Amino acid sequence: MLPINNNFSLPQNSFYNTISGTYADYFSAWDKWEKQALPGEERDEAVSRLKECLINNSDELRLDRLNLSSLPDNLPAQITLLNVSYNQLTNLPELPVTLKKLYSASNKLSELPVLPPALESLQVQHNELENLPALPDSLLTMNISYNEIVSLPSLPQALKNLRATRNFLTELPAFSEGNNPVVREYFFDRNQISHIPESILNLRNECSIHISDNPLSSHALQALQRLTSSPDYHGPRIYFSMSDGQQNTLHRPLADAVTAWFPENKQSDVSQTWHAFEHEEHANTFSAFLDRLSDTVSARNTSGFREQVAAWLEKLSASAELRQQSFAVAADATESCEDRVALTWNNLRKTLLVHQASEGLFDNDTGALLSLGREMFRLEILEDIARDKVRTLHFVDEIEVYLAFQTMLAEKLQLSTAVKEMRFYGVSGVTANDLRTAEAMVRSREENEFTDWFSLWGPWHAVLKRTEADRWALAEEQKYEMLENEYPQRVADRLKASGLSGDADAEREAGAQVMRETEQQIYRQLTDEVLALRLSENGSQLHHS
């Protein structure tokens, strides 16, 4: 390998010139480009990598994260991969015709050069692109999310994965499938798309199109729902949302959004308290969430809802940990879809109750802790059911499906954390038969699985550590003794039985299974012992209808 030295000169009879005059041309141009560096640019490092790439005839050139404002005009002609992401580039030079993969994310590009004919992967998310050049037929994957693109060129038949989230697209491209076997997944979330072309139905049923958070007209939604509900439908799965796609980036100060939930005589003190939290992470989005929550069906129609929210906010003000958790949960729920906000409110109430249980609120009330655990178990099963339901739908807003099961079964399954009303149940695709089946499944699994689930539940472990320290310590000792003495042999036996001895991935999976079985055995024994003692004292029952 030839030595690398950014600062060496090329004498008239240098070794490089005797091999190829091309080296001298490249090196001279790169050295000149290096001398034009702006403050903060690492052009010396870039030139070092360029020369190394050329001398070694490498097919990869990585110039990412060097704070470069430009690239030299003459890149090594043999490269198939170019990574210039996370710089300050406003344009790219002519690209080598050999290039197959281009990574130029998180720059300031306003346009792209002509794309090489063999390009397979184009990753230019987080730039300032307003349009794209013609796309080569070889292109397989493309990420153009977080740009300013208003329209797309024709999509190559080979394109499998397209991410175009958060642009200014007003329409989808035409889709022509024919007998093409390619399974596609295209993301057009958070654009300005108001209608869907009929050509979308040309895609195969294994394909997925994501168009959430777009201002789709009610006519477009109804037409698509009618088409995709037909028994003869064989088109793609389409993910949408009832959000109109108009994201309101304006928000009022956190303290103002919070005090609006309180009676006037408390607002001054509340405002003073919450001013201290204005700069906490996700405070702005939490403020926006509170304003959106006030406009939900539950806020308008449910008696005592405002008082419930105010009481919850008081608890948040008293606990930095709970506030941090809640701000994070609410961070993605400020879209204008009302039911998304409602589902987030459900999750926030779950977060509160689980936090309270972990902090000791139910240490002396095992019956209440069991009831809470039972509700969390039921919600977990409903999420599994909703996830399975989503897979059966061709035109689906996942938020509406998840919320539908919680809302419509809130009374029958005694779900205290679930809102009792939702706005868009009609588009959820959840039927009365789905609800009956879900209720029966929850009750069946609860009867057979709840105690095992409860014995592994984190808040229950926190209670045991505080209130049954000796029993907990003994259980931990038994667990580690079993892991030390039996774990290796049990894993080996399992691998041998499946014919996977020596397989590292299988060993990790078998180890996790043995660990879970060990914990299940130890903690179930401890749980049965403690519950038998506590429930016999207060007359509570483990099984609950």
Curated annotation (Swiss-Prot):
Q: Where is this region: Linker?
A: 243-250
Protein EC: 2.3.2.27
What are the alphabetically sorted keywords of the record? Host cytoplasm, Host nucleus, Leucine-rich repeat, Plasmid, Repeat, Secreted, Transferase, Ubl conjugation, Ubl conjugation pathway, Virulence
Question: Which cysteine pairs are joined by S-S bonds?
Answer: none
Where does this polypeptide localize?
Answer: Secreted; Host cytoplasm; Host nucleus
Regulation (activators, inhibitors): Exists in an autoinhibited state in the absence of substrate protein, due to interactions of the leucine-rich repeats with NEL domain. Is activated upon binding to a substrate protein.
Q: Which reaction does it catalyse?
A: S-ubiquitinyl-[E2 ubiquitin-conjugating enzyme]-L-cysteine + [acceptor protein]-L-lysine = [E2 ubiquitin-conjugating enzyme]-L-cysteine + N(6)-ubiquitinyl-[acceptor protein]-L-lysine
What are the GO BP annotations of this UniProt entry? protein K27-linked ubiquitination; protein K48-linked ubiquitination; symbiont-mediated suppression of host innate immune response
List the Gene Ontology MF annotations in alphabetical order.
Answer: ubiquitin protein ligase activity; ubiquitin-protein transferase activity
Modifications after synthesis and translation = Ubiquitinated in the presence of host E1 ubiquitin-activating enzyme, E2 ubiquitin-conjugating enzyme and ubiquitin.
Residue ranges of region Interaction with target proteins?
A: 1-242
InterPro entries associated with the record: LRR-bact_E3_ubiq_ligases, LRR_dom_sf, LRR_E3_ligase_N, NEL_dom
Where does the NEL domain start and stop, copy by copy? 253-545
Residues the record marks as active site: C337 (glycyl thioester intermediate)
In residue numbers, the region (E3 ubiquitin-protein ligase catalytic domain) covers: 251-545
**SUPFAM superfamilies in the cross-refs:** L domain-like
Spell out the residue ranges that the record assigns to LRR repeats. Answer: 57-77, 78-99, 100-117, 118-139, 140-157, 158-179, 182-203, 205-228
The Swiss-Prot or TrEMBL note on domains reads: The LRR (leucine-rich repeat) repeats are involved in substrate recognition with target proteins.
**Subunit-structure text:** Also interacts with human and mouse U2AF1 (U2AF35).
Q: What does this protein do?
A: Effector E3 ubiquitin ligase that interferes with host's ubiquitination pathway and modulates the acute inflammatory responses, thus facilitating bacterial colonization within the host cell. Interacts with IKBKG (NEMO) and TNIP1 (ABIN-1), a ubiquitin-binding adapter protein, which results in TNIP1-dependent 'Lys-27'-linked polyubiquitination of IKBKG. Consequently, polyubiquitinated IKBKG undergoes proteasome-dependent degradation, which perturbs NF-kappa-B activation during bacterial infection. Mediates polyubiquitination of host U2AF1, leading to its proteasomal degradation.
Sequence similarity: Belongs to the LRR-containing bacterial E3 ligase family.
Protein name (Swiss-Prot/TrEMBL):
E3 ubiquitin-protein ligase ipaH9.8
Naturally occurring in which organism (per UniProt): Shigella dysenteriae serotype 1 (strain Sd197)
